[in-house]
Amino acid sequence: RRDEHGFLIGKEKDWVYIDWADMDKDGPLCAEQMLYAACFRVMAEISKQLGKDGNVYRQEYEKLTAAIEKFFWDEEKGAYIDSFTSGKRNVTRHANIFAILFDIADKQKQEKILTNVLENDEIPAITTPYFNFFELDVLCQMGKLTEVLDKIRSYWGGMLDLGAVTFWEEYDPSVPKEEQSAMYGDPSGKTGCHASAASPV
């Protein structure tokens, strides 16, 4: 379902998963809209490669990205917010990473995101190897190769330092070693070998 702005909206009991993160999911979720916009752009490119007219997809992409800019960009924070309906104006890394990864943010906004989000320790860190991959990708695009190598050594290396022989579904370095296996309300609920966790290998 879409609302009057073209944003995807869920039903009351829908589960919207972007990552295991504390996002403000009141109303349309910014990261989800960015994924949706990226789909339109890809469909336009596929149409072009097939010799078809992909104009309808390009138009949807333009309309959706314009709405994203209007409702989710917060100039004061220099970042995209999770939700505009709750009034919280909460910033997480996820939508801002997608904004750079999918080239939704212009170069000026990308630099603001780098400073205000990606290099800002006050913005909660990503705790899944799966989504850390996207952050590393964006940092590489922005020329932060030393930081990327440091992150691989500290994050994936941190799991190895704790005795991991495979990479976990989730790893939060701030959690005590004896609690690292806990997830889903189960003291041993975390997947100890997760395919999406192996991205730098």
Where do the language-model regions lie?
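Active-site core of glycosidic bond-cleaving carbohydrate-active enzymes
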Residues: 1-201
